[in-house]
C-alpha cells in the first residue's frame, strides 16, 4: 500500500480572472455565498518592474475558506495572470495550496505516489544559505534535505514558510 499524503487541509484556492472581472466575481461570492473581503491589494502593492496584479481574498465568516481572486494590472510585459487567462481561454483556478504539519514527509510520500514537483536550481539554495546567515530567522529543518526535495523557503523577520509546487496538472 502507498504511504499517506499527510495533508491536513486546503489552505486556499486562487482564481485568476481577466482584467476588469475581479470585482464582479468578488461581488458574486458576497451575494451568493455570503463571503466577505478578508484582504485586498492593488497594483501599487503587488508589482515588479514588468508586471502587476490586483487581488481580493474572499473568505467565509468562519475564515476557514479563503479564495484569492486575482486580475492583471497594466505593466511593461504580460503578467502571469494574463498569460494564464490567454492560455486557458478564460478564468480558472491557478493553484490550490494544501497545508501539512510535515512537508518533508508529505513530499516524500507524494513522490512515492508519482507526484512530480517543479525543479529548483541548486544556486537557489546556495544564495539562500548566504542570505540566511545574515538573517535572524533560523530554519529548523535540514537545508540539505530541503534542497534534495526542492522545497522552497519564503521568509521575513517574522518567520518562514516552506512550500513546493507540483508540475502543472490539467
Which positions does each model-derived feature cover?
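Glyoxalase I/VOC metalloenzyme domain signal
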Residues: 1-38, 47-170
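Active-site and NAD+-binding cores of ADP-ribose-processing enzymes
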Residues: 42
Amino acid at each position: 500500500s502507498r504511504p499517506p499524503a499527510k495533508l491536513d487541509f486546503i489552505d486556499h484556492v486562487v482564481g485568476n480572472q481577466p482584467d476588469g472581472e475581479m470585482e464582479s466575481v468578488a461581488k458574486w461570492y458576497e451575494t451568493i455565498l455570503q463571503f466577505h473581503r478578508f484582504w485586498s491589494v492593488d497594483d501599487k502593492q503587488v508589482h515588479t518592474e514588468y508586471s502587476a496584479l490586483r487581488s481580493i481574498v474572499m473568505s467565509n465568516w468562519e475564515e476557514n475558506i479563503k479564495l484569492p481572486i486575482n486580475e492583471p494590472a497594466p505593466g511593461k510585459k504580460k503578467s502571469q495572470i494574463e498569460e494564464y487567462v490567454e492560455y486557458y481561454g478564460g478564468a480558472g483556478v491557478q493553484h490550490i495550496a494544501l497545508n501539512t504539519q510535515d512537508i518533508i514527509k508529505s513530499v516524500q510520500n507524494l513522490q512515492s505516489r508519482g507526484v512530480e514537483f517543479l525543479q529548483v536550481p541548486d544556486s537557489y539554495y546556495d544564495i539562500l544559505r548566504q542570505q540566511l546567515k545574515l538573517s535572524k530567522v533560523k530554519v529548523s529543518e535540514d537545508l540539505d534535505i530541503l534542497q534534495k526535495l526542492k522545497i522552497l523557503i519564503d521568509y521575513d523577520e517574522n518567520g518562514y514558510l516552506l512550500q513546493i509546487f507540483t508540475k502543472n496538472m490539467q
